Regions:
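Basic/aromatic DNA-contact patch characteristic of tyrosine site-specific recombinases
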Residues: 1-91
Length: 91
């Protein structure tokens, strides 16, 4: 499986099979705004909330893609949508 070039609706089975780049990490953008899956050279994959607040870019680790504390793509989308709603209400 190749790295996606643009935003994709990330599915668990596809995400587990995203290739590891031994030289650098990369991010896969989900179709849900501000949700990214970060793939590290070690093979570790985790969800990231990537947003701009008051002109400053922020990245918040949500949790791992697999393992005992795994966060599913659906749960990651729910979390980001909730945070985005709260962030917009506070503006």
């Amino acid at each position: 499986m190749k790295k996606p070039k643009g935003p994709v609706n990330i599915k668990l089975q596809n995400a587990l099979n995203y290739p590891v780049d031994p030289d650098r990490d990369y991010r896969v953008a989900d179709t849900t705004k501000h949700l990214k899956l970060r793939v590290l050279p070690s093979g570790y994959k985790y969800w990231e909330y990537d947003y701009i607040w008051k002109g400053v870019r922020n990245k918040q680790e949500i949790g791992p893609l697999d393992g005992p504390n795994a966060i599913s793509p659906t749960k990651a989308r729910e979390l980001v949508n909730g945070w985005e709603h709260n962030r917009k209400v506070r503006k």
